[in-house]
């Protein structure tokens, strides 16, 4: 392991989408910019768009390194899909079968690409921004020469226990892979306790920063409701909000609802707005 000079470090964030509207993207920007005042900060991203005007990146020293994964071979895709199906629908979830599933979750050709990119940066620490990126880091842990951190932006319940969880049936795989990382960061002490009790994973707690400082107080005289978030299936509940507001506005016709965000459910929300 390389020794880190805490006074000045090379920090690499690994993230998929950076230049889009979302809570993770905004929080990443605030933390990356704050750290760049003292450290060399680079964001390694698969985002094909670069818009430095977003989130104030243009006024910072944060660097960007964009790349893409080449399509894997037909045989590799077939083997990965085949084992993934077996793991999810038949095999017992043990440490060994979870290790095998890790190979299908993130193919070898992708591992080589990611490890090569990380090693080329010669960084002191690489941080996987949200669960999937952290799982990618655990898959290449033995191939890279740097400390690894998984930064988890969702709760245990959101990953495994909600009606539409992010990682259904993958708790054993998650436990095995996250245990390989040097550190894990969660957003609350409640989450840290839950991951420790249920998975024996020790996590550091770092709260998300305030990314927008409020000015003044809202007043009911404004007659305006604002909702902000990513348009993701089964998690944000904007569809429920639209339906609820359609009931509310019948007795409060001078109120408006504004929803800000983007994501795969935008078309659904627009159709609901037209319907209600």
Question: Language model features by range: what are they?
Answer:
Residues 15-21, 38-100:
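N-terminal strand-loop element at the rim of the active site
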Residues 17-19, 228-234, 263:
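Short donor-sugar binding/catalytic loops of nucleotide-sugar-dependent glycosyltransferases
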Residues 39-40, 238, 242-276:
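A conserved nucleotide-sugar
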Residues 65, 147, 157, 174-215:
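Donor nucleotide-sugar binding/catalytic pocket of nucleotide-sugar-dependent glycosyltransferases
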Residues 107, 128-133, 152:
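Short His-centered aromatic/hydrophobic patch
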Residues 112-119, 152-156, 165-184:
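Membrane-proximal helix-turn-helix segments that form the acceptor-binding/catalytic region
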